[in-house]
């Protein structure tokens, strides 16, 4: 049996490490491997921590390995990184924050170079700014716009920052082959021969290390349950090496029917959420959020309003409901149509592709979200469902919406109605128009049978160019606005049908012209052949 060689501060854990087997190997071999790879070079480590069982097992393994090293060998930084999407399931995000703080505090006491860092999406890439601000539809399997913006990009930016400081980094993940076969295949494909490392699929100078990739779920829980059987006087059941306790994590899994965790996503090959896992409470990739439903049934009833809100968003993704909640125009200002199917006549009528959510629904949903936030805090749950920077960003998105510019500037009023107070709203320095201007413009536009939104966009363009000595590109911008689809869907479809008929006529005319040209060529060839035949006959007659 393998014995741990480097066991400097592991007196309470040494028997556990030397005697317990994981995936058919002594735990001592895994700890020694971590120590060997850690000491092999000066590349710092970035440990992805999602708060779930697998990432908790990885940080536990690394923590034990570092405890076993003499202080002089603990020279390399270990950055413990979690990704906060700002819409994480509340009980999960609370557990992550507390655990991260305890790990860093325990590491400081033990003299380990571990620091904790939380990354989050940039304000313009958050869930609410995109959904409520820009009107992006709730994510689905076919349009999962959230993963890259909210998870991949923040973690990638952190890794890139460390690469710029240290030239290279090693990213330590809790990926297991039994959890994600596709992820295991990707890592194996990029494996560096003769090492336990793999090249990152997208980030240069970043390398992947998966120390528990062969473990099964029982191995993970065995490590998290701890060494209490070997040191009953010093270590309690579920106690972790930094002085915390893993029982809340176990309880969380039990209360949610062991749904699993949402992994720290670092690239497209990492399985994202959407399969009844812990993750974003707003996730609509699945029909039902079974994890949250189970948590509510097992004592977290206060989260019921969040589940109801999430179910509302999921309802809007049903194909039969899309036309109700979503604009018929895309954010480009144009109506898009489905591509013709194989074998379908080009003249066949095609369905339009819905665009962003109507502004009126975004306004309604923002108010409902703020009411839920207010009520939960009044009940004693300290929670932020939407941040102030997000509210400011959403307001700007509404004011400058490409299809429905919010000249009424409704967001401050919505916030005031819910909270009976104002935020420090930015006053637009470009003479932003107000509700009275919008009312007047709508009234005048109706008399001239033009879309008031088009006139609003034209006026906004003029204001934005006011005072410039060179109004470069203004005609292109004017043309872009005028070429958008303005009017009702029926009017736009009538224009599209007329254009389609004209195109059909053009296509048919082109075909007729082509056939006539070919006919002329054939006729000419027939004439030439006939003339040639006559000449041959005359030559034959003269020869006789």
What kind of feature is each model-predicted range?
Residues 52:
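Conserved G/P- and acidic residue-centered "switch" motifs that form tight phosphate/ATP-binding loops
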Residues 1-46, 56-544:
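Nucleotide-activated chemistry modules centered on ATP-dependent adenylation/adenylyltransferase
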Residues 49:
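The Walker A (P-loop) glycine that initiates the GxxxxGKT/S ATP-binding motif of P-loop NTPases
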